[in-house]
């Protein structure tokens, strides 16, 4: 009976997992020096998202690559953030993020521009569901720092309604000030 319950739970977990897309960003072989020599292991950096505005990243370490990837994927699913997207395809405004020596600049882009971003940032945007964005990495090219800096920038992304509420003005007034918005596009 316990086996049947476990199978049912696994099936439910698989259905929930199918809504997420995961991308392997980086695998690193690490060595631990012990008395008898070196013990090799692997560290994996994975980005997971639902392509609808939720995204997370995780880091996993294990003796085997598949186990490290599994651990990283589970860690990414546990620590996800929501990012408001404009028209479901791009960012609402330009934003900058930092982590350590890594610095990234993210800019909203017009429809059809595509994802113009390098390496680890591209994986974040693809799993997030962004279709049009221009991103530039300044500083460190370490994938861990780039991903964390990208997440720092995405955490500062705000919906115009939230910005209007924060400033104490009407949403329509804020939208009227935008030069690239015609009508009421969101």
Curated annotation (Swiss-Prot):
Instruction: Please provide the record's free-text comment about the domains of this protein.
Output: The N-terminal domain interacts with the head of the 30S subunit; the C-terminal domain interacts with the body and contacts protein S4. The interaction surface between S4 and S5 is involved in control of translational fidelity.
Function, please?
With S4 and S12 plays an important role in translational accuracy. Located at the back of the 30S subunit body where it stabilizes the conformation of the head with respect to the body.
One Gene Ontology cellular component term attached to this UniProt record is: small ribosomal subunit
Q: What lineage does the source organism belong to? A: Bacteria, Pseudomonadati, Pseudomonadota, Alphaproteobacteria, Hyphomicrobiales
* UniProt-listed InterPro entries: Ribosomal_Su5_D2-typ_SF, Ribosomal_uS5, Ribosomal_uS5_bac-type, Ribosomal_uS5_C, Ribosomal_uS5_N, Ribosomal_uS5_N_CS, Ribsml_uS5_D2-typ_fold_subgr
GO BP annotations of the record are:
translation
- NCBIfam families assigned to the protein according to its UniProt record, in alphabetical order: rpsE_bact
Ordered alphabetically, the record's keywords are: Ribonucleoprotein, Ribosomal protein, RNA-binding, rRNA-binding
Q: Which organism is it from?
A: Brucella anthropi (strain ATCC 49188 / DSM 6882 / CCUG 24695 / JCM 21032 / LMG 3331 / NBRC 15819 / NCTC 12168 / Alc 37)
Tagged with keyword Ribonucleoprotein: yes
The S5 DRBM domain covers 20-83
Annotated protein name in UniProt: Small ribosomal subunit protein uS5
Please name the HAMAP family in this protein's record. Answer: Ribosomal_uS5_B
Subunit relationships: Part of the 30S ribosomal subunit. Contacts proteins S4 and S8.
Q: Which family does it belong to?
A: Belongs to the universal ribosomal protein uS5 family.
